[in-house]
């Protein structure tokens, strides 16, 4: 089998920007997760626990980078949710490790996807809309969101557990309304 990409030459890196540890709903310690991904040949990882910001600088190696990040979610009526993964760069992030967003969560600071995106950008982070099909949102629920780095078009956990990890249709609609937005997949 021949590997093909859009580019014939260049440096290519494999990574995962959406995974959880035992700090939220994952089943492994952050250091064990990082070790498994390194052993599988990944170059980068973001441990994005729910409502807990993780920096994990101690897990970085010369050939492996752990991006700081979190996943924030908002419940909507009719069993729908917005899930947004925010990732920082070590040079730009201004949110401390293990920050729980308690004050922001109870007020109006993080009450809409747009406010989450703006808050995270003001603190040196970019935001990706996570697994819209699994979250049961309608494309109309997300079409007016601005400032996203991209959308997660495939989430393997959602596909494996519930057969609803493929969000290509949402991405297609979002592109039609918003023009350029990157797409991401996670395992």
PLM region spans:
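A metal-dependent hydrolase metal-coordination microenvironment
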Residues: 2-126, 130, 137-139, 143-147, ...
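Short acidic/histidine-rich active-site segments
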Residues: 180-187
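Short, well-ordered beta-to-alpha junction loops that form the rim of enzyme active sites
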Residues: 130-133, 187
